[in-house]
Amino acid sequence: MKKKIHPAYSQIIATCSCGNIIEIFSTVNVNLNLDICAKCHPFYTGKQRIIDTGGRVERFKKRFKLIKKDTV
């Protein structure tokens, strides 16, 4: 590697809104504030919420059937 052409690589602190502190290395010399991390993300914690759109789909199909019957 050529000398004096690469950016400075330093240790920074990334702080999550849940309070988790992560020390990482980066060329950006500014500490980061994160909205979500692996400790509080629903995918990693296993506390996923499944959104049930079945009721909406069924209601749409029901409306579509009524319109189709009226026009025929």
Swiss-Prot record:
Annotated GO biological process: translation
Record keywords: Metal-binding, Ribonucleoprotein, Ribosomal protein, RNA-binding, rRNA-binding, Zinc
Gene Ontology molecular function: metal ion binding; rRNA binding; structural constituent of ribosome
One GO cellular component term noted in the UniProt record for this chain: ribosome
Cofactor binding description: Binds 1 zinc ion per subunit.
Cofactor(s) the protein requires to work: Zn(2+)
InterPro entries per UniProt: Ribosomal_bL28/bL31-like_sf, Ribosomal_bL31, Ribosomal_bL31_A, Ribosomal_bL31_sf
Annotated binding of Zn(2+), by residue: C16, C18, C37, C40
SUPFAM superfamilies in the cross-refs: L28p-like
Described function: Binds the 23S rRNA.
Family as reported in the entry's similarity comment: Belongs to the bacterial ribosomal protein bL31 family. Type A subfamily.
Assembly and oligomerization: Part of the 50S ribosomal subunit.
UniProt name for this protein: Large ribosomal subunit protein bL31
